[in-house]
């Protein structure tokens, strides 16, 4: 039996590295691709030397050459946190456009099925709640967050064009807020920001009045959803996330309680176009994939905080 080969872009990132682990575990030959713009080599260091893992350092916006057959391609390369895409706005747009074009071209050439990592940010600051796949969104295309939102919307449009015009097998996942080990403490999103401040004994910064909501999905649950979607026969976008919604203020209080810190909450100005609500409607994922999250927020947070404590104490563990 010939071992099937999988290419994962953004392999050294938070999500990409967990996907590498999953596909190696499932018996695939995994080719990880990353240029380390925001990815961390430590996330995949444990895979080096594994005969079922190969790494290519490469910018996905340039021509991608992979020798031999590919069964699947998972496109997860992109700056994904506000700090990164505000620092790297043009690169963010390029990876969503040029990078996606290169990936889809490779999928066409290899006759490979490709899964594209989109995001709940395609819904922008939503006027419908919770958000379901048929909602077209409320996005400011020229706002500071627009570089990420529109890159992902373009990515979806190009993916569907390749599916319809070139008959490429495509899958699109819309990922909602996800957390777990290998997140960067400095990536600017609520969870690592709150945990980092708490562990350093600093006050926790809540933007606005903290009434805005998010829904946090543990990374293992997300990876299971990605795996099931890839193997499904469905080509339109599918939401994968945890519908357990919480306000940012209550979330900050949870982090304070979990870390046992004496940190106080301080309020800061809400950034432009920051979504007021975010909650996935996962009816489609339940129906199509038999998927729903299994890991509670309390369980997932404990694992994640333990990971961050080791990082702060200078012990790298992946």
Per-region residue spans from a language model:
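Nucleotide-sugar-dependent glycosyltransferase donor-binding/catalytic pocket residues
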Residues: 78, 93, 183-187, 215
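N-terminal Rossmann-like NAD(P)+-binding domain of SDR-like oxidoreductases, especially those catalyzing
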Residues: 1-178, 220, 295, 303, ...
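C-terminal substrate-binding subdomain of Rossmann-fold SDR/epimerase-dehydratase oxidoreductases
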Residues: 10, 19, 58, 177, ...
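A glycine/serine/threonine-rich, flexible loop-to-helix segment
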Residues: 129-130, 185-193
């Amino acid at each position: 039996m010939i071992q099937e080969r999988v290419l994962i872009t953004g392999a050294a990132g938070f999500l990409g590295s967990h996907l590498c682990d999953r596909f190696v575990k499932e018996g695939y030959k995994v080719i990880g691709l990353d240029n380390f713009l925001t990815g961390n080599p430590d996330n995949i260091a444990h895979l080096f030397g594994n005969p079922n893992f190969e790494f290519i350092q490469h910018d996905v916006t340039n021509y991608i050459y992979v020798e031999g057959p590919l069964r699947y391609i998972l496109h997860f390369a992109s700056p994904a946190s506000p700090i990164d895409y505000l620092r790297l706005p043009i690169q963010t747009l390029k990876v969503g456009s040029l990078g996606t074009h290169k990936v889809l071209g490779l999928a066409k050439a290899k006759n490979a099925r490709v899964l594209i990592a989109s995001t709940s940010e395609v819904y922008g600051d939503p006027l419908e709640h919770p958000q379901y796949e048929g909602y077209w969104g409320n996005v400011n295309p020229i706002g500071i967050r627009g570089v990420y939102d529109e890159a992902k919307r373009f990515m979806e449009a190009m993916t569907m064009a390749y599916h319809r015009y070139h008959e490429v097998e495509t899958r699109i996942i819309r990922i909602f807020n996800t957390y777990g080990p290998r997140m960067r403490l400095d990536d600017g999103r609520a969870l690592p920001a709150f945990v980092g401040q708490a562990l350093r004994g600093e006050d926790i910064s809540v933007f606005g009045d903290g009434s805005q909501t998010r829904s946090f999905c543990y990374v293992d649950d997300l990876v299971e959803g990605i795996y099931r979607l890839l193997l499904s026969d469905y080509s339109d976008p599918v939401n994968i996330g945890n519908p357990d919604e919480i306000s940012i203020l209550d979330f900050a209080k949870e982090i304070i309680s979990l870390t046992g810190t004496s940190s106080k909450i301080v309020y800061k100005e809400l950034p432009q176009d920051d979504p007021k609500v975010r909650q996935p409607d996962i009816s489609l994922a339940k129906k199509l994939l038999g998927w729903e999250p299994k890991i509670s927020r309390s369980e997932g947070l404990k694992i994640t905080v333990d990971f961050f404590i080791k990082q702060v104490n200078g012990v790298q563990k992946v």
